[in-house]
Amino acid sequence: MSSFKSKTPSLPSQAVGASVDRDQAVTSNVTDTISTLRWSPVASYLAASSWDGKVHIYDVANDLTAKGVGVIDAGSPVFTCDWNQDGTIVAGAGAGKKVYLLSAATGQATSFIAHDAPIRSLRFVKVPNAPLDIIVTGSWDKTVRYWDVRNTGSPLATLTCKERVYSMDAADGLLVIATADRHIQLVDLKADPNNFKNSTTNDPLKHQTHVVTAFPDGKGYAVGSIEGRAGIKMFPETSSDNSFTFRCHRHEAPAPKGAAKDVTKTVDVWAVNDINFHPVHTSIFTTAGSDGCIYFWDRLAHARFYTFPRREGAISASAFSRDGRVFAYAVGYDWAMGYAKNSPTYPLKLMLHPVADEEVKPRKG
């Protein structure tokens, strides 16, 4: 596998800096770290699931002012959320083993028990000859289940995974599931819902998978790990594909004062918490990490060309709006440094960044 063309991939301060002067903080009553951010596919509504036991929904105006317009109260930490294809339903799930559904039109909320252990991820997906609103849920009970929201009495199908589901994403017929022990399961959603075709491969990275994100066209996926590395994999795999791995959220620590020139260098390694592809310029993607950094990359050029100024806390979640003009990101404690480093004064923010053309347009040459 190849790597990104960057002389100093672990030194974001030497990359071209994205301006955050116009970033807007969302006034919010979120009281704990945001776990997932998802934009409506049809409007400027943003859903934010949180460890505070709620999914908060915001209406974002053109000037990036935002107001709360709805809440799902799950009563226990919510790890994931998503919108259905026409933006009429918001779903959330997490520690309570239930899926919660909120109708955007009526404000009515319903729920159903979906798994025997916490639900780590859910996505609305398209499958052949099936109703519009199919939810796929991935759980620590080592299963992925498919649900028709009109009839949640039993799943349409169940896929047994090799280990606990840690991350999951879907786009254009491809479902990517990352589990414990670095297994990646790839599911062809265009197959018969009762006979989903899937294959299992190993994560190209050496340490535990933290996040997977499908390409917008379903022809591959990105993966990030706890070791400050990420990778790009094509689907289906071929002998001449463009898969590669690269370092990202790593920082060389300054040498102790008076240290010899040949002293062994120390590198701080941070988890990759989230990866997002731009919906218009689909070769462009972002990585967000425990180090408080956000990077913009071009997977075709193998180049990193923008980085945000390092934020004051970990970036726990991020997402592009449906037109790619707004990039939402959350700052909050992600437990990467353990219990001892948590504090009531740790930053807790939801930010909206207006995306400049030069940040996302692929560069020629």
Question: What are the residue ranges of the model-derived segments?
Answer:
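WD40-repeat beta-propeller superdomains and closely related acidic/aromatic-rich repeat-like regions
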Residues: 1-365
